[in-house]
Amino acid sequence: MVWRVPPFLLPILFLASHVGAAVDLTLLANLRLTDPQRFFLTCVSGEAGAGRGSDAWGPPLLLEKDDRIVRTPPGPPLRLARNGSHQVTLRGFSKPSDLVGVFSCVGGAGARRTRVIYVHNSPGAHLLPDKVTHTVNKGDTAVLSARVHKEKQTDVIWKSNGSYFYTLDWHEAQDGRFLLQLPNVQPPSSGIYSATYLEASPLGSAFFRLIVRGCGAGRWGPGCTKECPGCLHGGVCHDHDGECVCPPGFTGTRCEQACREGRFGQSCQEQCPGISGCRGLTFCLPDPYGCSCGSGWRGSQCQEACAPGHFGADCRLQCQCQNGGTCDRFSGCVCPSGWHGVHCEKSDRIPQILNMASELEFNLETMPRINCAAAGNPFPVRGSIELRKPDGTVLLSTKAIVEPEKTTAEFEVPRLVLADSGFWECRVSTSGGQDSRRFKVNVKVPPVPLAAPRLLTKQSRQLVVSPLVSFSGDGPISTVRLHYRPQDSTMDWSTIVVDPSENVTLMNLRPKTGYSVRVQLSRPGEGGEGAWGPPTLMTTDCPEPLLQPWLEGWHVEGTDRLRVSWSLPLVPGPLVGDGFLLRLWDGTRGQERRENVSSPQARTALLTGLTPGTHYQLDVQLYHCTLLGPASPPAHVLLPPSGPPAPRHLHAQALSDSEIQLTWKHPEALPGPISKYVVEVQVAGGAGDPLWIDVDRPEETSTIIRGLNASTRYLFRMRASIQGLGDWSNTVEESTLGNGLQAEGPVQESRAAEEGLDQQLILAVVGSVSATCLTILAALLTLVCIRRSCLHRRRTFTYQSGSGEETILQFSSGTLTLTRRPKLQPEPLSYPVLEWEDITFEDLIGEGNFGQVIRAMIKKDGLKMNAAIKMLKEYASENDHRDFAGELEVLCKLGHHPNIINLLGACKNRGYLYIAIEYAPYGNLLDFLRKSRVLETDPAFAREHGTASTLSSRQLLRFASDAANGMQYLSEKQFIHRDLAARNVLVGENLASKIADFGLSRGEEVYVKKTMGRLPVRWMAIESLNYSVYTTKSDVWSFGVLLWEIVSLGGTPYCGMTCAELYEKLPQGYRMEQPRNCDDEVYELMRQCWRDRPYERPPFAQIALQLGRMLEARKAYVNMSLFENFTYAGIDATAEEA
């Protein structure tokens, strides 16, 4: 039974497969290989530059399986392999069900982007199509026939593009076939159709592809008003451009020429693989052709040779040879001598156009010569050959060359315009008949630069220029011609011709001179040179200073002042230089100070404001403009330490014959806490050394000096100490009592009394001196114990581990030993050891309150490499040491991954720990994103190129994908980051993003924060804000915010909202709005990360997989174009602190 579908039920879904003119693109399925694991699909492009990416003026070939309509059980991912520049192969099928479905290959660029579609049916299906591809004209009736292969006594369901279409009773089968008749089909009826037994597996369906041309039979064009050229050998007229899409094995404007056996492609340039030729291969071409066997083969597996008298694709053509011609199943009739034509029906007496190219290309406004050769009997002469333009204009030949076997007419074409693009025709007419050949003429516009060339680097006598810029007109660019000459000069331009892929170095220029530079681009062919582009001014640099100074000497003029002097070698001529640059490097702090001496005649300088007690490395360089000359050999200078100001209002008061009390006031403007006071005691007028006494209680403002001699005048002064001794106070005098000196008045005493007093005085002095010695000895022992305790504390750090146990970390050569107090057994963690001598500190990268990061060159395993060295400052607290040691533990346990900042090694020196990690040359991701906001940094560039960022959509998506891979690794290691944000993601080599800052990471599944501290509120999940609970799902929430930061080019999350508002609105369902430049799919991923219930948020493995698929899709998921009213997301630096 045949079911006729009413017009109002025609399907509206179809697969778009072609835009623009036909592209030389072929998709081959090797049906000889029945084993799924050996089966493969190959897509071949005959286009120039196909498959080589944007560098070849077009995107790469894409071959994939389309699961939107025919869905099969998921399996391992298929493998895509590229063979050369124009071929891609899809492999990796594991079971027969993997083969069933729709496959597509996409090639071409711009308006010529083309999709070729192949539908694969299971050989063991219940129903099989009599013919898979059906190409019909608009308004025709299409009949789809499904042959019963394995009978089931159930109804048959027809579907269109995966949706229900119609049901047939199983009794309605005719001759073992179920038919679907579609009358008056229209282009929207195109698509994938299937016939399936009710309740049977979809894999047992018969799949069809219906292609409906946009015009009626023999017509093409927007209004279907143009007549098709009459395609031969089964070719199909394209309804958009009127070209013939030739079946595999034929070529030519009208598919009139047969390829050699085993050849295919628009120019017969491709060869079927293997010794079997095209046997067992299905060829799929751009619509409206569809798919078929190769020429000379037929059958569902394309392995049956044509029956006698048949030839061509699917053996659909009949030879019907006349005049003794024989039928060849690949090319058709092979005519005997004296006859030609499709059926050998034409005598050789009829004239024939010879060897006419099917396509010619010329440049705009050129006057080319076109040759047309013909043969026949009678012989063609000059007047019998003419040339017709697309507008019907007839051109007569200006010259004819007569040879024994042919006549070649030469036509001089008037100056070409764009309207001359199209199909031209060469026609020959003699008394024996006439012949014509159509060929396509493409008129190309020479390229013209839209912008001036870019200056890459400059020196005093050369400029390095990037000449290839955006241009209008047609490519490809064959040569670049660059003109340059001094500014405001009337001399001739100097010219350099280079390859378009190379930068240009302009040599032997004058220093500090402006040069006008412009570019001319050329494409292949006569007249391919475009107009000159806009000029730009490029200025050479000043001449480099070549003299190397040397340091003559230096002397310290104070604790923070240094006088430096230097000299230069004597050379003839004027001095090339504008001044001197003095550099002081503080290796302890990792800081460099630069002092500019602006006079080239200066040979001395006073450096002030230096840090007392600091060891500096000093050198001097001559500079000219912005160029530095060679540095002098370095010198090493140690400044003396400085102490606090002198104590104030020192006063002395005698208490007895052996004691004097000193009182004072603390110094003002102290740079830090006083560690002690030092008192100097000296007998007035005495010649011996003074005695220094330490006052170890710095909070006191008085002390008693004991053990003095009676009736003796003493001099006193004192100073404070803060990491160094300070200035002395004023000197005061005071005498001890005795020998008639009393506190309240003179007392008269006898001689005997005086002798007794002398004996008492001697005993008092001896006792006082003995007590003083014992006190000093006890103090020394105390200092030794304190020093040992400090050294031990410097080498041992205690921190709270993830398990809640207090952990002691002790560092030895190459191991980090963790002793958990509840346990008796230590747990050593090994780390790579770096020797202190193998670390060369360079520039300061960053600095915090208690730590700093310095770029350094390290030597590891015999190789030198850049590294970032993390260290704590001297006054860091025990908590800082705990977190720092905890970060080393995390790095040791994490191991290596390309998307995290990895540990290179650790080193201990003088009891301090130094951690070496990978160096990220591009800094943190947040700053990198904000620097890309080119509309703010270079508005002219942004508007000229129509872009809001120097980063592409693909690169932004790559940042997110790398971060997701890194977080997947952390989550698999059961680590919680707790502070995931763009500021804590670093950009390394090749712009790969790496998760960093593991100071807050925890190696456990759930962590509950119990201490106070600043919180990254804008990145925190709801459960973390409300209950201080952190899990991997909390990191997933933060990743959603990170993804928003990437899309917004470093915007501040929830900009304009306070933290209090976030606490209130987030539990109520409020989320950040979708950025205007963000695709729906990316924003949906953000929303999934911000779900209220943590268990509903996707795992990092799923996030990484989704972002990876987005990267493979090559779709602009983040729009960086300058659309109307474009604005960047807001930035609030104060809000980011919370």
From Swiss-Prot:
Protein name: Tyrosine-protein kinase receptor Tie-1
Database matches in InterPro entries: EGF-like_dom, FN3_dom, FN3_sf, Ig-like_dom_sf, Ig-like_fold, Ig_sub, Immunoglobulin_dom, Kinase-like_dom_sf
Spans through the membrane: 760-784
Annotated catalysed reactions: L-tyrosyl-[protein] + ATP = O-phospho-L-tyrosyl-[protein] + ADP + H(+)
Modified-residue entries (Phosphotyrosine), positions: Y1007
Linked pathology: Lymphatic malformation 11: A form of primary lymphedema, a disease characterized by swelling of body parts due to developmental anomalies and functional defects of the lymphatic system. Patients with lymphedema may suffer from recurrent local infections. LMPHM11 is an autosomal dominant form characterized by onset of lower extremity edema in the second or third decade of life. Some affected individuals may have subclinical lymphatic malformations.
Organism for this UniProt entry: Homo sapiens
One GO cellular component term noted in the UniProt record for this chain: receptor complex
Domain Fibronectin type-III, residue spans: 446-545, 548-642, 646-739
KW Signal (keyword) present: yes
Gene (name only): TIE1
